Amino acid sequence: MILSDADIRRRLDEGDLAIEPLDDPELQVQPASVDLRLGREFLEFQRANISCIHPTSEREVDEYVDETYVEEGEEFVLHPGDFVLGTTKERVEIPPDLIAHVEGRSSLGRLAIVVHATAGLCDPGYQGQITLELSNLGTAPVALSPGMRISQLTFTELKSPAERPYGAERGSKYQGQTGPQASRIQGDREFGGDQ
């Protein structure tokens, strides 16, 4: 069952679902979602002469990105074809009986801005800010401002709570993240890690 605005407000009031800071619930809580705002931090991928990035090499992944901070009131311009990692301003805590889905806002989609490439899911038990995989699929640059509503978070109630929620065991490499996080795929078991 997808949670309605009344369900979302009730879960927030009960404290088992947390979204902080939720500065303007009247504006941010929508009929079946919560609007999340854009944070100030971005990871920009360098336009370098790199023949190939090996996702399993933490050094190569780290060398490929630059951190950028944008103050509220200023703009981050996302150019056509660009891909950057951003973050939500809000930190979320998802209880074991809910799963959350990150979606773009239709108003930004109509400007050709997408907020996730593949990672649109927040597992039960996840805690932290949400990394956004921002792309401009259009033909004109688009200015994004920290604090603007950038995405929607919807919640689906599970038939039963997760037995092993995110953060309880291995495989929780993004638990508690602050700011955008580059890939940590090198920590996956199939690549020699313990995740």
From Swiss-Prot:
It is an enzyme of class 3 (hydrolase). Keywords: Hydrolase, Nucleotide metabolism, Nucleotide-binding. It comes from the Archaea. Residues 174-184 have a biased composition (Polar residues). PANTHER family: DCTP DEAMINASE. Catalyzes the deamination of dCTP to dUTP. This is dCTP deaminase. The gene is dcd.
